[in-house]
A protein has these predicted regions:
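Hydrophobic targeting segments
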Residues: 2-6, 23, 33-37
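Short, solvent-exposed loop/turn segments at secondary-structure junctions
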Residues: 9-11, 43-44, 65, 89-91, ...
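Conserved catalytic core of nucleotide-sugar-dependent glycosyltransferases
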Residues: 93-174, 178-179
Length: 292
């Protein structure tokens, strides 16, 4: 059974309105057998008191810091276990019933089926598309194998401690991505599911729990980028000049241009819409309506 790992910090009175509410709305999840929540020792009694009725497999204590939370979750599961990692501020997961209709977006209620689908397609780590904008999704398959970043808000992987554990919080997603690109030649991408989040706008959260919570935010995050670039795989796949993200008030790394990456690392694997149709021959449709 696919496990769901959620890391949270300082949001014992918010998490139920976000990720836990989203997961509880799913018709095909059994959180009592799937959900593992990682919190700090200081937060543990607050979460236990706030969430007495929430079904979960376990609540574990991890050191402060986003990377420590993820590392603790990775250590919790046995090698090879399929796990979806999620942040604590996901208020909904959106998709489109019709790939040509921007007004057909809706809240997904069958994430269990979709997680199983993703793990059937990919033995490699995979992420989800960042944007709900239909214009940027036109022409993309539901799932594909490509060179792209695995965003940190939610992603999936089979547990592999050498691949998934990192030494720093800021840029941990880029470090994992670089390792996966080096090992597998690409990562999985689920293009038509988008998590509704509010990164950096809610009190608490992983951005407040470690090396992104300092007063000198810009300087600290730029230093973290430069530290990440000391790893050979990160330096290979990412631009060497950290980029300042105005909306987030921090520095981050960007993948090298896709054309440059494709020339150096040619791709030969892609999953198209026909993948779903082949698995469901009695439902020939160009719409996702029957899928959901």
């Amino acid at each position: 059974m696919i496990k769901i790992a959620v890391r949270s910090y300082g949001r014992h009175n918010q998490i139920w309105k976000k990720t836990l509410s989203t997961l509880s709305a799913q018709k095909d999840l059994d959180l009592g057998r799937q959900l593992v929540l990682a919190v700090t020792k200081e937060d543990y009694p607050l979460y236990k008191a706030e969430l007495p009725e929430v079904p979960m497999l376990d609540m574990i204590i991890v050191p402060k810091g986003g990377h420590n939370a993820t590392n603790g979750l990775v250590d919790y599961f046995p090698d090879g276990e399929p796990v979806i990692f999620m942040d604590d501020d996901i208020s909904a997961v959106k998709c489109y019933r019709d790939i040509m209709d921007k007004d057909s977006r809706f809240d997904v209620t069958n994430l269990g089926e979709l997680f199983e689908y993703a793990f059937r397609q990919f033995s490699e780590p995979f992420g989800f598309d960042f944007t709900p904008n239909l214009m940027f999704k036109q022409g993309k398959p539901f799932a594909e194998f490509k060179m792209r970043k695995i965003g940190g808000a939610w992603w999936g992987a089979h547990i592999d401690k050498t691949l998934l554990k990192t030494e720093q919080s800021h840029e941990d997603d880029n470090i994992r991505t670089a390792r996966a690109l080096h090992r597998h030649g690409g990562v999985g991408s689920i293009n038509w599911l988008v998590a509704a989040t509010a990164v950096g706008t809610n009190k608490g959260g992983m951005q407040s729990s470690g090396d992104r919570g300092t007063d000198e935010r810009a300087a600290a995050t730029k230093a973290a980028c430069l530290t990440a670039l000391e790893q050979a795989h990160v330096a290979t796949y990412y631009q060497h000049d950290p980029t300042f993200i105005d909306s987030m008030d921090f520095y981050s790394l960007r993948l090298r241009g896709i054309k440059e990456l494709r020339k150096q690392f040619p791709m030969n694997k892609e999953l198209k819409w026909s993948t779903y149709l082949q698995e469901n021959p009695d439902k020939p449709t160009s719409s996702l309506e029957d899928f959901f």
